[in-house]
Amino acid sequence: MDLSLSGGDFRFAFNNVNFSDRLLRIEITQSSGEGEVICSSIVDWARDRKRRREDVTNHTNDATCHVESDLNKNSCEIVNENSNNKTQVLVTAAEQEPKSGGEDENERLTNNNTSVLSVQELHISSAILAAKSPFFYKLFSNGMLESEQKQMTLKIDASEETAVMELLKFMYSNSLSVTASSALLDVLMVADKFEVASCMKYCSQLLLKMPMTLESSLLLLDLPSSLLMADSVKPLTNAARQFIASRYKNMSKITMEELMALPLVGIEAILASDGLEIQSEDVVYEVVLKWVKSHYSVLEARQEVLGSHLARYIRFPHMTTDRLKKILTSNDFRPSVASKLVVEALFFKTESLAHQHVLLAHEQPASTSRRFAKRAYVHRPIKIVEFAVPRPQCIIYLDLKRKECESIYPSSRISSQQFTLGGQGFFLSAQCNMDHLCLIHCFGLFIGMQENGSASASVTVDYDFSVRSKPTMEFVGKFKGIYTFTRGKAVGCRNLLGIPWDIFTAKNCPYFINDVLHLRADLSIRL
């Protein structure tokens, strides 16, 4: 038999007076006036659980392991602090008689408006509990009055009763009788409160083996911050984030109603994902704004949530300059926050590709806050340089990775983010085409006018397509022309580089520089 107190099986000693040296009275309390909450949605469920947790925290005293003794009453009150969790322990002198069930109502009420619903008494071994929990070790060995007492009273909230009893049994047996995920989460939380690391690890391992659901993943991410930081819990919370990110990976298949019903931790998990498939970061931002406005009606509250919680997950450097300009003139953020975010984004856009890679390298891959990393955008980000005189014109830079180009074979396309020229919305489209004269596949580039503009709008544009090439690394002109655009129309070149597809994708192709194809479009309005 393993005689190690930290790892042995001592279930035979649980609540057995022959193997115990102390009596633990557990007072089950409940705040007066607390009503029942009926949860009708996922967000209500998550919020009610958090509210319940905060209520338990608020009705106990803040603690820094201090002692307030009253020698006349022959008792003292110990309050222990474990991160954000507070546990109140009343230690009573051994010679003091336990209170009978006939105590009056005033004695049944604590001084912080909580009532004692019931009392359980357990015979405990201080050695076993101290070996499992630094909380109990400090309680039994601090050299003060309470460490010498044979009876102590532990006050817990009614919502914690089952979990605390399971925890105490675990400290003797290294096993749990509960199997439901919600019950294991409750045990995990009280194990954190009483610093029973072995139970935290045990609960996490059991939960990791269970099928993840949206409800369970949201509850995991809504755990207290101190618990989320525990090493034994991190694999569990990482799995919860990955589950939510995978479930909402393709945003085009998710209804807006479903997104709006998610709590804050759910939205954060979605936004933190690099693999989020969405048209552009502009669309990500619009979704975030809708969510914030649906959950926070007060402007100041929206600004606080956006600035303190959600901004870290938004990839502002990959938003269009038009959208960044709107952020500066809107009240979405506090002015100082908006300026900082937009300036940082614009500076990133102007950096060389090499320096952008340096900034990306400085971001931790495991971090949930990745400001510079691209997502799996349906519409690829661009760089744009605009001129107002002598006539409206712009230079568009579109970079495509070799794998992205290979993915459009034999007949697909990649579209860029929208940009504005002459008051109209345009986009670039890289395509794999069939050259009908030579009957070969080839790489083509087109410019198109958005279909959501005015039906009568028309604008004449001079366009010039070029591509960067080895060995000079300069842009070389490939195709140019003049075209009068109307809504939904596009123009371009089916074989921009004048070579077959297999030569274009070959390793020695001069147009791929470090496996990146650099395209440029010079556009100007003909007045």
From Swiss-Prot:
InterPro entries per record: BACK, BTB/POZ_dom, POB1-like, SKP1/BTB/POZ_sf
PROSITE patterns: BTB (PS50097)
Alphabetized UniProt keyword annotations: Ubl conjugation pathway
GO annotation, biological process: protein ubiquitination
Pathway: Protein modification; protein ubiquitination
One Pfam family recorded for the sequence: BACK
Function: May act as a substrate-specific adapter of an E3 ubiquitin-protein ligase complex (CUL3-RBX1-BTB) which mediates the ubiquitination and subsequent proteasomal degradation of target proteins.
Full protein name: BTB/POZ domain-containing protein At4g01160
Natural source organism: Arabidopsis thaliana
